[in-house]
């Protein structure tokens, strides 16, 4: 069973490698480790995980869905947690759900629209 203690050990091992990078940093490296989280079920759980990371001076990217049956990204509580994560240095991105879409032009348009909406709602730019 997953525990925060186990996760801290994973983070410690990654830190020892010196390979931790965000998406922009990875573009300039031959070797890197990117930590990312696709948030499928719980903003609250992602928030707790981000606190563990911050306690170890670790940064990763959290991808949230605009349309999700498990959470409402725009509830006041969820927005406050996500804004706090961003303010504490975590990267926030869009976890796009195709929901049956197949037209690439429409998909690109929808991704851009969702990123713009989230940027407006959160008050910071969503670029990932």
Predicted ranges, named:
Residues 1-128:
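Catalytic alpha-helical scaffold of carbohydrate-active enzymes acting on polysaccharides/glycoconjugates
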């Amino acid at each position: 069973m997953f525990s925060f203690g186990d996760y801290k050990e994973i983070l410690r091992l990654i830190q020892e490698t010196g390979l931790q990078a965000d998406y922009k940093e990875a573009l300039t490296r031959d070797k890197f480790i990117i930590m990312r989280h696709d948030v499928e079920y719980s903003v609250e759980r992602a928030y707790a995980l981000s606190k563990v990371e911050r306690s170890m001076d670790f940064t990763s990217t959290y991808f949230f869905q605009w349309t999700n049956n498990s959470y409402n990204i725009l509830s006041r509580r969820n927005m406050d947690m996500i804004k706090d994560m961003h303010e504490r240095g975590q990267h926030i991105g869009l976890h796009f759900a195709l929901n049956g879409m197949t037209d690439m032009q429409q998909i690109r348009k929808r991704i851009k629209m969702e990123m713009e909406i989230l940027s407006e709602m959160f008050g910071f730019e969503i670029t990932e």
